Amino acid sequence: MTYTLQHLEDKEAFQASFDLMRVLRSHVANQATYVAQLVRQTQQGYRLMAAWGGEHIVGLAGYRELENLLYGRFIYVDDLVVSPDLQHSGLGAWLLSAVREEAMQRSCDHFVLDTGLHMPLAQRFYFRQGLLARGMHFTQSLRAEGLA
């Protein structure tokens, strides 16, 4: 099958991506909340690239361009997900490569993402794509239940 890439930029397109994004972000339970958050994130520079197989979204890569003292200008990949029946097909590598190419076109210095310590298969995938583990990501919930 031939796949095409397209950035999703409106609420209808975001709605169409909801079911696939839930494969990665299962805690996002409500489509309306998801769409509203994507609208906010796009106002902050987030872009959502979709791989289409015919009329269906079969892969997503969400990312943003940032700049800091550690990396200079860089692309940060927030989300990368491929339809479960197409995993190991090369589609994830193709999406990641397309985002990396955009980073190079934008003269970014680095290409950065995080993956969970509980996801060894994802870690192996990222190593195969040429990414290296350079640190450990720490987080703390600022909700009342996270401060106890």
Which functions belong to the PLM regions below?
Residues 1-11, 146-148:
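Conserved N-terminal entry element of GNAT/NAT acetyltransferase domains
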Residues 28-48:
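Active-site rim helix/loop that mediates acceptor-substrate recognition in acyltransferases
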Residues 82, 88-101, 128:
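Conserved acetyl-CoA-binding loop-helix of GNAT-fold acetyltransferases
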Residues 93, 117-136, 140:
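Conserved active-site alpha-helix within GNAT-family acetyltransferase domains
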Residues 3, 54-60, 75:
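Glycine-rich phosphate/pyrophosphate-binding loop shared by adenosine-nucleotide-utilizing enzymes
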Residues 50, 56-65, 81:
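Conserved beta-strand in the GNAT
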Residues 66-77, 87, 133-134:
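A conserved beta-turn-beta hairpin within the catalytic core of GNAT-like acetyltransferases
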Residues 103-115:
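Conserved GNAT acetyl-CoA-binding A-motif
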